[in-house]
Amino acid sequence: MAKIVQRSEILFRAPTRIGLLADVTERLFAKGVNVLGIRAYEEDGTGVFLIFTDDSRGATEALETLGEGHLGSIPVIAALVPNDPGQLAAISRVLANADINVTQVHATTTDAPTAEVVLTTDDNVRAMEALMQL
């Protein structure tokens, strides 16, 4: 059985520079924030970070201390599912059948018994309702 919850993912943008990733992650560590998932890339001279943590408020406070960049949050759905083949396919099919578009997805797992799928859709409320079927 899947556990489906509404969460927030941190969106942070700052001018690209050497050491930006180190500064971001050190601030999070100093605040005691655990990074559960991260996507970072450069776009037109800007470092873009999407950070999924165990403490969105603490992460926001930590990144505000950098004194640079733009900080925001994105509502996401977190689905904790068994770490078995086909789980992402099942999630994707449920959403497609409900006519819900997935606009962003990332997943994390290890040898643990569960995996976490984090996604944003064009209708998170309906998506959560649909995913409760899993």
Residue ranges: model-predicted function:
Residues M1-L134:
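A conserved regulatory-domain signal marking ACT and ACT-like small-molecule sensing domains
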